[in-house]
Amino acid sequence: LEDLMSLPFGSRWCMHEVLFDDSFLKDTGVSTLDFAKAMIDEGYHPMTMYFPLVVHGALLIEPTETESKEAIDQFIAVLAGLAKKAKQGDQAEWFKQAPRFTPRRRLDETAAARKPVLRWKPEEQSKDAAD
């Protein structure tokens, strides 16, 4: 993927994770969030976004050790396909519409953070527990 996506610390040996930044998306109109949301439509849970904070537009990928080489290769192919699509330069709107195939589309993350709607009901205590 190093020929399509940008590695902020160069191509060094890594153990179990890989970190990309968003410079490969420069001038495409596609944001880190847009790219991650498009992953959902491809059947993958998005990678960790915007962390670590010292990397602009960070995309942190940590596959589990139980994934087969074939599964990792397929994941890489999806990432490569999305990166190529973003670099076409005329696909920003396609990315901004993602995810398309989920029960809920894009949520208003700002409103959710500022005005959370949380539900929790304590379990009723039995009489024995009160004694």
What would you call each of these model-derived segments?
Residues 2-131:
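Non-catalytic terminal extensions of PLP-dependent enzymes
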